[in-house]
Amino acid sequence: MDLLQILLAIAGLLAILLLQKQWRTKTSPGAKAGRKLPPEPAGAWPVIGHLHKLGGPNPIYRNLAEWSDKYGPVMTLKLGMQNAVVVSDREAIKECFTTNDKALADRPPSSIGLHLGFNYAAIGAAPYGPYWRDMRKLVLLEVLSSRRLEMLRNVRISEIGTSIKELYSNIIRSSGGSGPAKVVISHWIEQLTLNYILRTIAGRRFSDDSSKDAQYVKGVINDFMYFAGQFVVSDVIPIPLLRWLDPQGHLKGMKRVAKEVDTMCEAWIQEHVQRRMREKPGPGQEQDFIDVLLNNRDVMRKAQEEIDNHVGKERWVDETDLKHLVYLQAIVKEGLRLYPPGPLGAPHRAIEDCQVGGYFIPKGTQLLVNVWKLHRDPRVWSEPEKFMPERFLTRQAEVDVFGHHFELLPFGSGRRACPGITFAVQVMHLTVARLLQGFDMTTPSNLPVDMTEGPGVTMPKAHPVEVLMMPRLPSALYEP
């Protein structure tokens, strides 16, 4: 039974709730006071709302973008039995994260927060309040502060260096030492990301993913990311029987993954404690960029020329060089504009009544920011569908990705913005710079990369991208 059949069955069994829904609408604060609510697309059904119209081959953010063209940049959406507001233009989003930042700082309850967020203990899923404020302060001071990121600098440099050398060895082995070799770049990015995480939080890495431990850890992390991006029907149709039946099987999967993550992290903690007892203290989104560069070879060549001019070919680019690589920075910004990590961002919830774009937003309403639509607004971006890093060297030169410019919000804005922005940007810049400096890249038969999005919360590619890679630096730089 697919999702649409499940929704239709629920609608048929529970249509009687429509009367209750109508009564609630008539007695809601907005209705009683005659306040202006955001426009709502036609076609909402009892109980399931607009869910049946959000299915199909197109990603949800594309469907919502089409609706916003018709109904406006602030519109109401019925997510099952929950009311949501979707915003998609700079002015409305700025109002959300400035004037109404506190009013919209909450997170809606969800199965993801309950199970994968360990009963909302994770900072990203925690409701707004004293606990979240204390956790955010702890994370910013002890994990993501400038001092801590500087302490982790050697980890970043070491891991990207080791991973590049492993990539070089694989290319030489596959090509026999001459000519390019075919690489599925997403697999290398996944391995690099896994080792970044492991070295940062557990002080360990895997040289490849063939070992039993590596396969297990990678499987747990992949499962975690998969279920973190799944839609759970009972979240928006909160009927106990539906949660108990778990028709999609997602709740069972989330509970299993949560136990595996807990067991894995506990083992790492114990290993770390034992190591600290034995030792004395000592001093202490990249795939999209490559894919889009393969479709824009002139941009890739300009970035390589910039690196060659500022760094040369006798040493590897370092973090201290990045501030001089302005074209590379523009490439990263443009990649994040076209392919943000979360095209719909993380959901918010109103903890009090507020106004957005002249519309009344009642307490308890969910807020969705269509970042994908925002980043393609033709009123802000000339030729918005085109990959043009040069825009960030001219008209939009002052625009950054840190949540201060409301036309570019790949990591969110306001008090619930991603706290790891600085770390993420550092890693992306260094990874892209080293790949471009170290390798010439093209596609088999010089065909364009298929950028079609697959299902998921982070705009994954529908088809793995194969890249022909060839080293472009002296061989001594790749040696261990």
Curated annotation (Swiss-Prot):
EC numbers for this chain: 1.14.14.104
GO molecular function: heme binding; iron ion binding; isomerase activity; monooxygenase activity; vinorine hydroxylase activity
Cofactor or coenzyme needed: heme
GO biological process: indole alkaloid biosynthetic process
Binding site for heme: C418
Tagged with keyword Flavoprotein: no
Protein name per Swiss-Prot or TrEMBL: Vinorine hydroxylase
Protein source organism: Rauvolfia serpentina
